[in-house]
């Protein structure tokens, strides 16, 4: 290789990342216009386009590098020099942390995810921990109640860049003050002030004002979801001021925010104070930097592994027919491997399963589908694997495993947030907790369906319960669009004997679903059946599902709320907004 080529390659990779993040910011900056125009289908398409940008630009850089090197092979010393040059470019680079992830992605694409060593990759960052570059302007603005909270909130709202008229600004301000007074008390509120992010956070059909409520006893989140009426007027739907509420808004089961962040590390650090339960990976994920979130997630896994004496075990719950799932007992994530062979009733391919997981990545997850990170050639030390799990891996996924002696390499897996399987949760709870879980499950089904997602397999074992008590779907191998399903009523039996026959008396085609049958597997438990009939009986009617399909086909995009209906100002304070 010619001398100096290492620097050219390093510069080419960094320039490629510049191009990628520039397009990322360009797509993100269109969020305000899409919101103001109420172009919800464009919102959905922009989200998909932004997700695809990263891999597209990695591919462009890989082709450039193949041209630069004329396809010649490179030795280890050459690759180390490339990384050294790249590292020297980062100290003054504003997005150094994501640039390292981009370097990793280019390397993995070039070398087909082989030889993934710390010497060749940024397994951990080359820069000091939580180091930030000079911020050209503050991320947020402070507002003090020098003339009272009504004046303060009027200034906050007047500072917003949105160009639509407000339905009733004074009403919304009084709702916020009423909520804050109930939360803090009049005296504490008078001594508090706000710090509000300069950029709005856009997602689905809402623009979120994100801020900090700074009180004498600590800092609280201050979140205002701004929506539009059917007439295109703005209103504030609620005010959220607890870390639990903020955690759900920024949750792993929701689509990524569109927020203009030229310095993502600084924004992540600013958010950390109001989202103390979120990891660095989760914060990057929330603002749409999902590939760097994957890097941070892997680092969190390595740090945990280094500090524990645990072994991987099969994850609790009913064993899946498509995926082999394992975990570390104290770690909050699960590892999912597609089995070599599926149960006979699962007539699908591994490629189909991967396509389903990609669909979830790109779709609006409406707070009801867990996000995943996809890994190739994932290395595990044998000493960290329990004998029972090792036996299971070799039995169910041998084709995806390479034995390296002291290690194994799993060709492909997903990492996902660990939850309590809903079937286990339902066995353990009674009373109000049981009622809440069934209400949550039905709401999850409804919200997925409204977002054009049919889970396919609706058994409780395919859903999990988060630490906030939310029910989330996590088994995607039978997922499909609502519009692809044919929801049918079961025809009446022709003769009395029909109901006793082992085969149905009616024809069943691929894609046919009979909602009446849901009752058999969802209501078998006598504790659960009456709750279902009370709260979700319409889920057992085909006409309910067909009506949803019609709304989807007509282009209607449902509102998605990251909080309970009872928290909406219109419900809490009695005035309906429409």
Swiss-Prot record:
This is Isocitrate dehydrogenase kinase/phosphatase. NCBIfam families: PRK02946.1 (NF002804). One of its GO terms (biological process) is glucose metabolic process. It comes from the Bacteria. Keywords: ATP-binding, Cytoplasm, Glyoxylate bypass, Hydrolase, Kinase, Nucleotide-binding, Protein phosphatase, Serine/threonine-protein kinase, Transferase, Tricarboxylic acid cycle. One of its GO terms (molecular function) is phosphoprotein phosphatase activity. The gene is aceK. Belongs to the AceK family. ATP binds at residues 315-321, 336. InterPro entries: AceK_kinase (IPR046855), AceK_regulatory (IPR046854), Isocitrate_DH_AceK (IPR010452). GO terms for cellular component: cytoplasm. It is found in: Cytoplasm. Its EC number is 2.7.11.5, 3.1.3.-. It catalyses: L-seryl-[isocitrate dehydrogenase] + ATP = O-phospho-L-seryl-[isocitrate dehydrogenase] + ADP + H(+). Bifunctional enzyme which can phosphorylate or dephosphorylate isocitrate dehydrogenase (IDH) on a specific serine residue. This is a regulatory mechanism which enables bacteria to bypass the Krebs cycle via the glyoxylate shunt in response to the source of carbon. When bacteria are grown on glucose, IDH is fully active and unphosphorylated, but when grown on acetate or ethanol, the activity of IDH declines drastically concomitant with its phosphorylation. The active site is at residue 371. Pfam families: AceK_kinase, AceK_regulatory.
